[in-house]
A protein has these predicted regions:
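Active-site-proximal alpha-helix that buttresses catalytic centers in soluble enzyme cores
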Residues: 9-307
Length: 307
């Protein structure tokens, strides 16, 4: 099929293509927490105690007064849209408005016949990117004239590694008393698939770029039920302290932005473990809308469109 170049991207003739950025979503006000958690739990309404616990966590990280935390997806969309130099860029959340249903309805109304989707999570897992994939397939049954592709992972791009290399190097990771702990979101052991191997491959590559001879891999933010991939970040921190570390540097490279699983699980829970042991806690900055980091996503999109 003949192809034509448009704004740095390539699309097939007679096909209008939209890019759909997919993200988890985050509550913007306390009243969002009930529908948000209910959606995460697939329609199961949380108990009053569960809501109280979650509210306390968001209160602790200053969620309700931090505009950037509330609009992170929009900021990432702006950066990605600028890098790709296109107008047909949409954003949808898995658990908050603007929902995936709303976004696809808007895309269809605008006349697009093809959608290329990318999830903010860099690694593919069945419960992560797979959840978006399954929901897309369900929604698109009502749109038989729209074709859809999803980029399942995009971590294996040089910009991804360069971002984390530069941030880790700035933390002086080679000091003798320092333990570097790489972490990604845990998943149920029954759904691991290739996720663990890909995450481990990435952490090994970052460590090699920095010159680390010894580091730790941990898994964090697991649900409080069922069997999840380990070791947990809490247990790894405790082991690093036993091994003699006086300074802990956390690298949550499986995540892309500041949110409750970083600002609470890492910066409050993990910090408390470290500081209660008399050691120093540090965490490298998250990418958020960093241009270098977002270029890894843009590169994956260009590659898919031009294949």
């Amino acid at each position: 099929m003949k192809r034509a170049v448009n704004c740095g991207l390539v699309k097939a003739d007679n096909m209008k293509q939209a890019i759909l950025l997919l993200s988890f979503g985050t509550p913007r006000q306390p009243s969002d927490l009930l529908p948000y958690l209910t959606s995460i739990r697939r329609g199961k309404i949380p108990t009053e105690r569960e809501l109280k616990v979650l509210t306390a966590r968001y209160d602790a990280i200053g969620q309700w007064d931090n505009k950037l935390l509330q609009t992170m997806g929009e900021e990432q969309k702006k950066t990605l849209k600028s890098l790709l130099a296109i107008d047909a860029m949409y954003l949808a959340y898995l658990h908050m408005p603007n929902s995936m249903e709303q976004a696809i309805e808007s895309i269809a109304t605008a006349g697009y016949t093809s959608i290329l989707c990318i999830v903010t999570s860099p690694f593919y897992s069945m419960i992560g990117t797979g959840a978006y994939e399954r929901k897309l397939h369900s929604i698109l049954r009502a749109y038989p004239d729209i074709s859809c592709e999803i980029i399942k992972s995009w971590w294996n791009r040089p910009q991804f590694f360069e971002y984390w290399r530069s941030q880790l190097m700035a933390a002086n990771p080679l000091q003798a008393d320092t333990a570097c702990i790489f972490s990604a979101h845990s998943v149920p052991t029954s759904t691991v698939g290739s996720y663990e191997d890909e995450v481990m491959s990435a952490s090994n590559q970052i460590a090699k770029m920095v010159g680390l001879n010894h580091w730790y891999q941990a898994w964090q933010s697991a649900a409080p039920y069922g069997e999840w991939l380990g070791p947990t970040i809490e247990s790894v921190i405790e082991q690093a302290l036993i091994d003699g570390a006086k300074r802990i540097v956390c690298i949550p490279f499986g995540f892309v932005s500041d949110h409750v699983e970083i600002l609470y699980d890492n910066d409050i829970i993990c910090r408390n473990i470290v500081e209660n042991a008399g050691a120093t806690y540090e965490r490298v900055p998250m990418p958020n809308g960093n241009t270098l980091f977002m270029e890894a996503m843009a590169k994956a999109i260009r590659e898919r469109i031009n294949k």
